[in-house]
Amino acid sequence: MKIGIIGGSDGLGKTLIYYFRDEFDVAISARDHIKGRKVAEEMNVDYVESNTQLAAMSDMLVISVPINNTVSVIREVGPFMRKGSVMVDVTSIKEEPLRAMEESLPENVEYIPTHPVFGPRTTELDNQIIVLTPTKKGEWYKRVHDYLESKNMRVIETTAEHHDYMMSIVQVLTHFSFISTASAMEKLKVDINETEDYESPIYNLMIDMIARIVSQNPYLTYYIQSMNNNGPKIRKVFSEAVDELRDAIDSEDDEKFVEIAINATKNMGDIQNALGMSDKAITALSHEYSLLNESVGHEIALKHIYSGKVHVGVLERVNGKTAILDNGTKLRVANVEVLSDEELYQWKLDNIEWKKQSISCVFSESVIPNVIVETLEKVDEVIEVVLTDIYQGPQIDEGFKSLTFEVTALSNEAIQNVKSILTGFGGVLR
């Protein structure tokens, strides 16, 4: 199946290449042809300069362009789509893209307005939410729905109108309040780094979430606000809520403040579940820092959560939000996962060149070779020990025997430890 992605050089469109390329024949287009070709080459997919040409050759056409361009691109390419194909968009508003599809696509072309409720930094589809807002369900709908469920995604089906209302809460309201908070901090000339000395776990989580939103493309954030038809009402109610709360405090009306707080709490749903989830997040953050502090002076493996690269070394120190290894590598704690001892060992097996050495040692003939082998295989970083020879004859005194072991290990240090244990058993190295 041929999947075309208009807007495949950036953002979610680029992320979709990663998900699709192993299962489908993928081609992309982009506004910046130089960048588009580079991404296509890096991701090993085809590049097509013309949006309309890509539409004409695709079984499924994915529109992944900025919100403010989505409708115009749909109208541009819609008439060129071939019979039996399907158009999918991935923008975070649905009413206007749906209307454009209904008006510009031929009758024999299906369309499924969608909204993946996750960003381009998401590395796994498992348990991610995707919203479908179909008005018709043709042959393509079941195929798409089944594919998404096969990836363990949470598929929500609703109308475009209801979707946009829910997004006015999930995105418009939350983004507006977060950006307002960040803007207030900027106007107050707050030094965020200085507040870290006083931060509570909840403040820490809040700052990270706010930073995540304000660091997004500001044009994307703006169009999420301005192009959702429910936006004006949402922002008006938010401003009124802020004014009401401020007035209660300024007028020293504690009863009014408590009334507002209690009513707000009652509307927050399952409070115990929210407390449990936030406790888990706080515990996870604290556990990671505790684990790092306990590992100072010891070998550790840190996996970058975005690149997947594993950094191995002795942890020299944890300096604020940075972990520093003895080889000079500096990593932001927020961006790494501490691997377990078992995961570190497996990484070494997969990535370090194994050392092999044949070791001969003379023992009393009363020793039991299998016991020695079992003991040696328990040595740290020893992969395998094989008894290759038992010899009694010339050059070996009576009552003794020579045992030869082939030792496979991850380091020369491990092989030296094996030799030390052999001599500890009373053996004499040959």
Model-assigned labels for residue ranges:
Residues 1, 345-430:
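A carboxyl-terminal module marker
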Residues 321-363:
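C-terminal, non-catalytic macromolecule-binding modules
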Residues 1-44:
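NAD(P)+-binding Rossmann beta1-loop-alpha1 motif at the extreme N-terminus of oxidoreductases
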